């Protein structure tokens, strides 16, 4: 029997974003894969300066390396989580932490939002409503 795919669902508690992620997870299940999902609550580490943290994380996500990944992680507050194979998130606030966790733990990652400062190429799959890149990982209807 195959081991299940461990999915880390990053959530900032926005119903529409969670619905999008759950739709992707359902699609993976419907394709015949066994999955285990852990929802990880995410917030800003210092809420009163969240606009500054948002700016910092977006700029740092342009150049993912060990230092920028640590800095990005310091800007967020995360629930503890177990080992995962795929990290999935939706909404522009979560793209930098999705990217950082995937790079740090060498996992695949899926994100849904409009493009900002980061590169579509840094995601295993980047789902948008319109084409934002000619890369094959930019998935759209």
Which sequence ranges carry the predicted segments?
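Active-site and donor-binding regions of nucleotide-sugar-utilizing enzymes
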Residues: 9, 14-31, 37-138
